[in-house]
Amino acid sequence: MKTYLQSTSAAALAVALFSSSAVLADDTARVSVTPTPDAAGPEAANPLAELIVTAARGPQDPARVGQSVTVLTAADIAARQQVLVSDLVSRTVGVAMSRNGGPGGITTLRIRGAEGDQTVAVVDGVKINDPSAPGGGYNFANLLTGDVARIEILRGAQSTLWGGQAIGGVINLVTAEPAGAFEGGLQAEAGTQATTYLRGAVAGRSDHLVWRLSASRYETGGVSAYVGGAEDDGYRQAAVSGRARVSVTDDLSLDLRAVYTKNRNDFDGFPAPAYAFADTGQYAEIEELVAYGGLNLALLDGRLKNRLAFGYTNSDSLNYDPAQAVTPVTFDSTGRNRRWEYQGSLEITPAWTATFGAEREQASFRSRAPSAFAPSPVAARAEVGIDSLYAQVRGDLSDHLSVSVGLRRDSHDTFGDHTLGQVAGAWSIGEATLLRASFGQGFKAPTLYQLYSAYGNLGLAAEQADGWDLGVEHSVGDGWLVVAATGFWRDTENQIDFVSCAFGSLAAVCNPGGVARFGYYDNTAKTAAQGVELTAAVERGAFSLDANYSWTHTENRSAGANRGKQLARRPEHQANLAATWRWRSGLSATADIRHVGASFDNAANSYVLQPHTLLDLRASYPVNDTFEVYGRVDNVLDDSYETARNYGTQGRTATVGVRAKF
């Protein structure tokens, strides 16, 4: 793992499964490539490339990137053995996770204390945020590491290139590309809670075609979603993905990518007559499709690279309660997003590059909530479009100082025009010290669900944010020790939150049209977040250590009873430490400690989510060039804890597995 501005991690511990080029990471490796405007292109998928692609939607030397970025390569992902992307990303600095139950439960990742729906999630260059989700964010429960070759976590407001919704940051996942004419891999693992995971892939490369196909299946018996429940709530997912790049000429190519998943998760609800959280037989079925088609054209001897693309996401969700009279369906929704875009990258001089583009995003949603009293309600439907223009210029003012400046103009069908800016800089002091700083803005309009669903509020205002960060990184000796510190600040206006209605409330907003409802969405006039991120990485011979600490203080600064209170589910203190020993035989063993401090589950700060510390152990051994065996024990001490009030979490689990490549 590489945390630029935060740290440079120890060398990777194991061989990644699905790429014949995925070897132990070399911290001195450098890859020379021509800038490309594709954040999911071949350089992004290269597990050895020490280049950052998310910050500029094209490759950059990390020493010239002003933003805070953590990079997980294919080798990092394989070494950490996590099946769920959320479990992997939440161990990086500045990221907090909450989950409603075990695997499959609604999962939220918050970057630097921002709300989960203020994070832009991207797979192979396509934004996967769901327009039918309450906040328009992405439920990370259904995102598995699977065929992912690289993850970049970009912290702080990233409006210029990724849209105003990126108030907290961007999580960009890139699936693998082959290195040889034909290659493939298999993985199988099994563990406690009746958990199994199978996946496989084949891929190839020729002069004119690069292709890859993969499939996976994950299933677990899980734990009870209700913390006091007796029956377990399981989860399963089947997934297929593919990508192909056809080189028509040396300057013209076509990219096609797609990922499809089918998910089912059991959950608990609030059954009659008490309507209190309890064991139920409810479950959800979710189908997700992400598709991309792009045409790439290089002009001016490769100095001008153009990309014309269409991205499509579709999410269909159905919730069932077999005990409900008349109809078992309790929720039915569809979210769809179409995105047309042009992006260009012009090498003005060898030291300066401009990235620019235009986008049209069309989001639609349909949602209904049948019940025994209204088994066939009319579905709420809405659609909205956003037109955007953006430009960013980055380059070197000297051998030691690099800067980037960008602007974005969004035109929202409902909330009008908004201009957002961003600036960042990186300054090298000698060979061992690097200073970085950035400023960015965000603008997020209320979602279709927040406006038009049964809990909607047409009086909502758009969220707006300004964010800053300043950091220093220092390397000792030949890089055996790297330490870093970063401070950040963010002010947000009109943050949108869900407000519950008291039982029997007569307030008009709780009884629209004379019909009572459980709650509604409303603005919190002003919130703020500030914090410090510290990292250290040590590599001495066979021993390596990776550590990070995050202090994140959030505050409601609006008038009212909650003024001065912390925002919900934002731990103020978090720390992670991983210590690894590698033997000459190839055997490696890691002890991983995670600490999450106390937080509050609600805006009133009346319920405390207690702090917890978890110990995980993992090991791997390459039997030969083809096979690797591995195993892990998570939550070794079987500690009980909560990340959301009254929701269960996994106790001790054990897993063994095998990887093969050919």
Regions found by a protein language model. Give the residues of each.
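N-terminal periplasmic accessory domains that precede
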Residues: 85-88, 105-110, 119-122, 138-143, ...
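Extracytoplasmic beta-strand/coil segments of soluble accessory domains associated
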Residues: 54, 86, 90-127, 149
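Outer-membrane beta-barrel signature, preferentially recognizing the C-terminal barrel domain
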Residues: 273-294, 298, 333-335, 382-384, ...
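N-terminal Sec signal peptide and the immediately downstream disordered periplasmic leader
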Residues: 1-92, 203, 246, 250, ...
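Transmembrane beta-barrel wall of Gram-negative outer-membrane proteins
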Residues: 192-219, 229-265, 283-305, 348, ...
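Short acidic/polar hinge/loop motifs at secondary-structure boundaries
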Residues: 127-155, 242
